Amino acid sequence: MDKDPYIYRVKKVIKVVDGDTIDADIDLGFDISLTKRVRLSGVDTPESRTTDLKEKALGLEVKEWLKKKLQDQTDIIIKTELPDSTEKYGRILGQLFVGDKEVMSVNKKKSVNQQMIDEGYCWVYNGGTKKKDFAELEAKRKSTL
């Protein structure tokens, strides 16, 4: 039997840090919120802060894509597998869903994380060695246009 995920509502996206990380005010209920850094799980995007100019350009592009995706959204949900789903840098690790008024619909919708993969903005990442094949990303993005 699958375990139910933990669902958190985002009151406000404070900042898109890079293509796979945001700062957000998370609604804990009872008019209580907490500002946390959230790392999108299962993805690795090109870095926007690097000396590699090709990677930097791609990193800035995916950061802009994520900003547009989250801009003016009032219904953003973070779905995690554990109640304290944090990674080694203390960031919450989860999937983002936008436009979800009903919490239960997250199980039926495609996450922002998966959209990034499908549109060629990132690599699948589940720990371990990171793969940085920029040609693969560019080819996938061209095929989705």
Annotate the PLM regions.
Residues 1-145:
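Small beta-barrel nucleic-acid-binding modules, primarily SNase/OB-fold domains
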